[in-house]
């Protein structure tokens, strides 16, 4: 069976969708997937994933969530900034979606797959939704988008139509 280029996992808030798609992303990038589909946790790819620096993985989420653990956090300089005058955004901004363009235009490193995790999908504002839609309409080869949402009614119908949907 061929993997869809975009999968949207949806269900009530707090059931673990973000953790699930992070684990799914790791298993897609793992070099020695276990018989149960889980990532091995020991290969070079899993090592990079756990250290939040896998070259074929990107996570997109609002700035307001970046202090929470769950994947590719930007550790280092960003954590040492003094209190900013601007509150972290609760939206996924167009700049974040545009930043994926460079990532998607370079060749992949290990398995040939490139994985983008995006949550919560309803945090996409209108400009970022439209930018993502362009990518979903013409997905780069070997790229898989894993999205999570608490409410399908808050997403553009055109984005919904481009994703395989799984209720959780």
What is the role of each PLM region?
Residues 1-127:
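Clamp-loader machinery-focused feature within the broader ASCE/P-loop NTPase space
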Residues 105, 130-147:
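Conserved catalytic/switch belt of AAA+ P-loop NTPases
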Residues 120, 147-148, 167-168:
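Small/polar loops that bind or transfer phosphate-bearing groups
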